[in-house]
Every structure is written in structure tokens, then in C-alpha cells.
Amino acid sequence: MKKIWLALAGMVLAFSASAAQISDGKQYITLDKPVAGEPQVLEFFSFYCPHCYQFEEVLHVSDNVKKKLPKGTKMTKYHVEFLGPLGKELTQAWAVAMALGVEDKVTVPLFEAVQKTQTVQSAADIRKVFVDAGVKGEDYDAAWNSFVVKSLVAQQEKAAADLQLQGVPAMFVNGKYQINPQGMDTSSMDVFVQQYADTVKYLVDKK
């Protein structure tokens, strides 16, 4: 029993130490103008952004953040239109992915088609990535100009403007805090990712 208690106490102390090391201005920044009504955890990215590709494909930041979040916490991902020649089209395509619930199916193929093979040069090329990933062409076409997709595009644009987004990748919590990767421990990739995820969880709990 004593051993179990010591183990639990060690876990509590470890958590306390971890939480104590997270501070405003270092791992996160409190926004001057909080934005009400934003998703609990909101990530902005672009398929044109090399660092976003690293976050998704190499570091798996989003996956690690999701694992740490309390049950029921909503995590949302928005695409930005200010990067690349097809930024607007990719933002609309991401809205299609959200509407059809196929984000996980198309994320990696789109990143690779835009950055690795550079086979995405037109709106038709984007559509082909979806179809190759198993999305029916008719479903994609029906969603493309739908009211739902137009609304999701508007949501993405409004959130980026309201939060005064300066660049990507970026993550916000409760419309009040922005994660600051520059303040993270970069001694190793694992340490960086865990501190990033711990910071998001800390801010979700903080409310």
C-alpha cells in the first residue's frame, strides 16, 4: 500500500512540477483581446506550410495534444488561405473535408501532394487527391458549393481575422491563449511535443 501511495505521490509531484514550469509569456501568451465563441482548442495550418507538415507528419503534435485532452474537449483544425497560389481553394477543400468527416483520410495525402510531389497545381488536382483517398467524386462535388461548406469557409476566415493570426502552425485555447512554441524545451523532439501537449492541457484545465 505504501509503495502505491509513494508512486501516486510521485505522479502528483511530477504533475505539479510540470504545471509550475508552464508560465504566461513563455510556453503560452494571453491574448490582449480574448475572442468569445471560439472552439476550445483551435489549430490553424496550411498545406503549403513546411512547419505544419513537420508538426503533422514528423512530430505528430495534434495526435499528442488529443491524447492529453480531457474527455469531451473539442479540438478543431482550420486551414488558412493566405499561403500559396491555391490557398483559397485548399481552405474550401478543407471545409469539404470537415463537412464530409474525412479530415483524417485526406490530411496526409494533401500535405504530400502539395509539398512532396507538388502534384496539386489546380482545383481539379485537389479533387483528385480526395477521390484517390476514397471520397466519392459526386460527394465532393455536391459539398464544394454547398451552404455548409460556404459557412465553414467563412468560419475559418473569421476566426483567423478575430484572433489576429500572424502565421502557422498556431494553436489557441478557449479564444484566450496562444501556444508559444518558441518558449518550449527543444532539447529533443519528444520533450518538445510533450511540453506542447502539456501546455494545451494546462490551459484547457485553466479555463
UniProtKB/Swiss-Prot annotation:
Superkingdom field: Bacteria
Protein name, per record: Thiol:disulfide interchange protein DsbA
Disulfide bonds: C49-C52
Organism of origin: Salmonella typhi
Keyword presence, Repeat: no
Described purpose of this protein according to its UniProt entry: Required for disulfide bond formation in some periplasmic proteins such as PhoA or OmpA. Acts by transferring its disulfide bond to other proteins and is reduced in the process. DsbA is reoxidized by DsbB. It is required for pilus biogenesis.
Subcellular location, record wording: Periplasm
PROSITE patterns: THIOREDOXIN_1 (PS00194), THIOREDOXIN_2 (PS51352)
A family per Pfam: DSBA
Sequence similarity: Belongs to the thioredoxin family. DsbA subfamily.
